[in-house]
Regions:
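Extreme N-terminal starter segment of soluble prokaryotic enzymes
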Residues: 1-3
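Conserved Rossmann-like nucleotide-cofactor binding loop
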Residues: 11, 36, 139
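C-terminal helical "tail/cap" subdomain of flavin- and related membrane-associated enzymes
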Residues: 21, 62, 67, 289-377
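Conserved N-terminal glycine-rich FAD pyrophosphate-binding loop of Rossmann-like flavoproteins
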Residues: 35-53
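Conserved N-terminal helical subregion
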Residues: 47-161, 365-377
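Conserved FAD-binding catalytic core of PHBH/FMO-like flavoproteins
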Residues: 105, 128-246, 250
Length: 377
């Protein structure tokens, strides 16, 4: 088949590699609007078991990724300077650019070279392709085509992705008060020298702060002041660090005619559960498997992809939306005592009950039970 992949992010690069690896006879072309090596953001994070699927289906790529990742075994909550450790909740992270470089190397190994600096306004140039894959992210050109019946709505909080040269020891959620209202930061190292630092605030605080009316540098200075004790003198670093509201993207149809969507072009998962990149890679693997199984019977392959992937994806996306709801009200949660705040945080996505937490995080649960005992006396 002749296949066009629109978008050279993790989903597009990985799908291109898998399709060509599985069937060298496929003609695979990847079109990316940005120049090579030009990417936004800083690091991406995965839960500690999130890449197990990759080890099962593609151990070679897994073995290339794992040594390049930063790993830790605990999560830390920092409520106004008081810290609580959630033991046993591990994560791993890698720089987004480094991830793209590894996936590009895999792609090159099967003889596919993406075409960079190729922005697209429509899909007319793909009239002779058997399959067109939209892996072109939030502002997908492919998704704009009729037939997908997509819906986009914005959550109320505002956030921005920054970086810093302070390498944090573990993934930490830091919650602080400002003269205008509450702020929180999701921060974690993705290399020995750099960390991602995502800052979030609610709509009321955003409006009171006047952040929409000041310069990028003024916003950075304000955030460096709010999180001064967390950053310990290290400045925030920008890379297309635009303040915005999180878009929830959902599509009634995953494919239409010979077009199909994957990754953020198809769905979004709130960054508070750290699954966006994982879901994109899983989409690529699921679509490639369906095509491998059905061969040139494209419609059957696309139907199988949607039928088998949709239930799995829906659970994670639903959990991310539940988590996002908690963050929409994080200022209210900050009024809780630290142990109750941590309990509320853990319950935010509705996926972990208390019995399971005793197994996953025994030290934290022992502390929580002792706290409950103390306040009942």
């Amino acid at each position: 088949m002749k296949i066009a992949i629109v978008g050279g992010g993790p989903a597009g690069l990985y799908l291109g590699y898998l399709l060509k690896r599985d069937h060298s006879g496929h003609s695979v072309d990847i079109f990316e609007q940005n120049p090579q090596g030009n990417t936004w953001g800083f690091g991406v994070v995965f839960s500690d078991r999130a890449l197990d699927f990759l080890n099962l289906d593609d151990p070679e790529t897994y073995q290339r990724l794992i040594p390049k990742m930063e790993h830790w075994v605990d999560l830390k909550l920092d409520l106004l300077g008081e810290q609580i450790i959630l033991d046993g909740i591990g994560f791993a992270s890698i720089g987004r650019l480094q991830l793209l470089e590894i996936l590009s190397e895999r792609l090159t190994s099967v003889g596919v070279t993406p075409e960079f600096s190729t922005p697209l306004k429509d899909l007319s140039c793909f009239h002779d392709y058997d399959l067109v894959v939209g892996a072109d992210g939030l502002n997908s050109v492919v998704r704009q085509q009729p037939g997908f019946h997509s819906e986009t709505r914005l959550l109320s909080n505002f956030f921005a992705w920054y970086g810093t040269k302070k390498p944090f020891d573990t993934l930490t959620q830091s919650f602080r008060k400002s003269p205008w209202g509450p702020f929180n930061a999701h921060h974690y190292r993705y290399s020995k020298e750099m960390s991602t630092f995502i800052i979030e605030t609610n709509l009321e605080t955003w409006e009171r702060s006047g952040f929409s009316k000041i310069t990028d540098q003024e916003r950075i200075k304000a955030c460096e002041t709010i999180f001064a004790d967390v950053l310990e003198g290290e400045p925030l670093v920008q890379n297309r660090s635009t303040w915005r509201q999180f878009p929830v993207i959902q599509c009634e149809n995953w494919f239409h005619e010979n077009m199909v969507l994957i990754g953020d072009a198809l769905h979004t998962a709130h960054f508070s559960i750290g699954s966006g990149t994982r879901l994109a890679l899983e989409d690529s693997l699921a679509l490639s498997k369906a095509i491998r199984f059905h061969g040139t019977d494209l419609q059957s392959a696309l139907k199988t992809f949607e039928k088998e992937r949709k239930p799995v994806l829906s659970k994670l996306v639903d959990a991310s939306l539940q988590s996002a709801k908690w963050y929409e009200n994080f200022g209210e949660h900050m009024n809780l005592p630290p142990w109750e705040f941590a309990e509320s945080y853990l319950a935010r996505a509705g996926r972990i009950d208390e019995e399971r937490m005793k197994t996953i995080s025994p030290k934290f649960m022992a502390g929580l039970l002792q706290y409950r005992k103390n306040i009942s006396i």
